[in-house]
Amino acid sequence: MLLPFLFLPSLILAEVADYGTPPKGINPTLYSVDDKVIQLDESTFNETIFCTRSDCPSYLVEFYSDWCGHCRSFAPLYKQLAKDINSWNNVVRIGAMNCADSVNAATCRANGVAYFPYIKYFPRNSSDPTTGTLLRAFRTLSEMRDQVTKHVMDDYSVNRFEDWPNFDFLKDMTTFSELWEEVGANETAEHIAIVFENHPSSLTGAQLLMDLLPYNDRLYSRRALKNHPLVEALHLTDFPSLVIFKKGDRVPVVQAELRRLLFNEVEQFLHEEKEEVDPTIQFTARKNASEECINEPEKCKARYYVSEVDMLKAIRYAILRETARTGAPLSGSNLTALHGFLSSLHDHLPTVTFHGDEEQTLNRSSAAVTVFARMRDWLEEKGALASDNDSIVISVDDFQKEFLLAEENAGNPFPITIEWDHCKGSTRQMRGYSCGLWTTFHALSVTAYRQKENETDSSPLPLLTSIRSWVEHFFGCLHCRDHFLRMTTKTFPMEIEAKKFEDVFLYLWKAHNVVNARLKGRDTEDPMFLKYQFPARFLCSNCTASDESTIKPFLINYYSDIKPYTAPVEKANGNK
């Protein structure tokens, strides 16, 4: 049997990526060839980032997943950062890699990508992933720019690259001839710019030096502190200030406070005539979608259903890719979490769909359940249930290989190349995996209830806690994970809110609506699938959040009426 290329040595010829280079892979990306973001893939990462030439830049790389809500929210800021510091590209460049694409799995794992977005700064002439430094995904452009600046300056302080700006503060001098000696290193420059700063920790001067890099042949730039002798000679009182001298002159050709320069720019903007933006143009897609669902509820209703394709696609990605993302072994709490989630999938994944009085077997899901059973048993054979399973170490490579064998023996029940169904977004960057995962959670909870609704002593917590544990240890979107854990443990704790067995599905319904309320109106909201409080009126006209007696039967019917994945299951291979 041939295993997928995931486990074969890479035979891809190495290439160097540049602005406008389209990445290899099949997944949608959050960046385009028009952005000032260099898009990396498995074939270009090493040659680009681990460049050995003397003129190589350093790199800032975002490892992201196209399905990750936080990554989608962060992408506009990252594009803005790339555009803002594009003039620094001889010093540092901005790159990105989509870890959701299987072609990039090995590189993302080698870089220890524990969550998304995961940002690393690679100094010039980095040699391997360990040379990268983890950065934070700040919320503002200034914070991101300052963070990059600090790492560039740290890089310079160690290596002092001659073709980078000289970030050292100008030494004290008593004559202008000493100043011109500073320019002598750059014989073509006819001017010298000096940024006088208030404090050694200020980053303004360093950023301006890199902003001026494109003019380096005409303008030599340095920075100085407010106690420099030139400050008194030039009568400077406000900082930061910019002074530009022509070579050989003693009187500056430009002298201005940066605050005044910025104010003048704002003033010019305010006095310019701007085209009036028609407010009716804004948010057109969202408005149209909302009006459509009010005026034509049946048309909107047809877009909402539970799909076996969506669930199986999401489950396969969750089990095969998310568990192995970092390359960290399965041991202790994460091993327990994976075993618990596989057990829940085996016990509660719906294998039958109910449409009215009609009942139909979901053949693909039935086959998938055998995969979950095999993987659960395999983990138990390895010691997952041992009281001291911290001492058990299972490599994720071995786990993936076993999963692929189990999948093949079950007739390959999981859709891989098939598109998302109900979870297909209005663009390729919308919905997808996160939608499929939520759908799976809801369907598991409704099936669990149907299986035991007459058992009065059943607890809703085993399934709910298995879902939470899997999210805690394996879900890649850091922001989403943190919100989910905070909600389910603090703001809406499942141990307190889920008391009756019917809460096994009612709790998840309420929790999902909390998430929808938080995300409503954001850029990540698909205009064709607005973040309604579920169910929307066009799905259930008499449902209200305060009346669980109407919500309960609706949810049971909705998550039991599953659109089957109709492609036939391959003949199962009985060989282990």
Regions found by a protein language model. Give the residues of each.
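Cleavable N-terminal signal peptides of Sec/SRP-targeted secreted and luminal proteins
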Residues: 1-15
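N-terminal leader/targeting and pre-domain segments
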Residues: 12-58, 88, 97, 109, ...
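Non-globular targeting/processing and membrane-anchoring segments
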Residues: 15-30, 156-454, 474, 508
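Local sequence-structure signature of Cys/Sec-based thiol-disulfide redox active-site neighborhoods
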Residues: 25, 44-85, 175-211, 460, ...
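Thiol-based oxidoreductase modules, predominantly thioredoxin-like and allied folds used
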Residues: 37-42, 63, 75, 86-106, ...
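A short, hydrophobic beta-strand/beta-hairpin element that forms part of a small beta-sheet core
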Residues: 59, 78, 114-134, 232-260, ...
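Alpha-helical bundle/repeat cores within regulatory domains of eukaryotic proteins
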Residues: 443-564
